[in-house]
Amino acid sequence: MTQDVNDAAAFAAATGAGPQAIADLERYRSYLAEWNEKMNLVGPATLDVFWSRHAWDSAQILPLAPDALTWADLGTGAGLPGIVLAIMGKDRPGFHVHLVDSLTKRCRFLNEVVT
């Protein structure tokens, strides 16, 4: 899917994300920017294009398995695509995303994001 998703409004229009999902993604983006200063979670230049590079790229996976309720993001790193999938599926009963990473520091970041 090729689409210009340069901001939260465009992301909402492209995905049908509601206000709470957008607020949760903004919160995630804030955590990502803050923690990225301490450890290299994503390339610094990609923070400026969060909506197209991270949120939209991650959200595009959902339509490929529309009935899937359980997802595993192995080697999740910064939580992509897992955190975005979890936010987008939050209102679906039984929807779960498992985030798996081998580095303790990244797991600390992920725990901070999801709590």
Identify the role of each PLM range.
Residues 5, 22, 42, 49, ...:
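Extended aliphatic helical segments
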Residues 23, 45, 49-56, 80, ...:
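Residues at secondary-structure transition points
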Residues 1-44, 48:
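N-terminal auxiliary segments of SAM/dcSAM-dependent transferases
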Residues 59-115:
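Conserved SAM/SAH cofactor-binding pocket of Class I
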Residues 25-29, 35, 54-55, 80, ...:
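Broad hydrophobic/π-residue packing in well-ordered secondary structure
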Residues 34, 38, 50-69:
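Conserved alpha-helix/loop element of class I SAM-dependent methyltransferases that forms part
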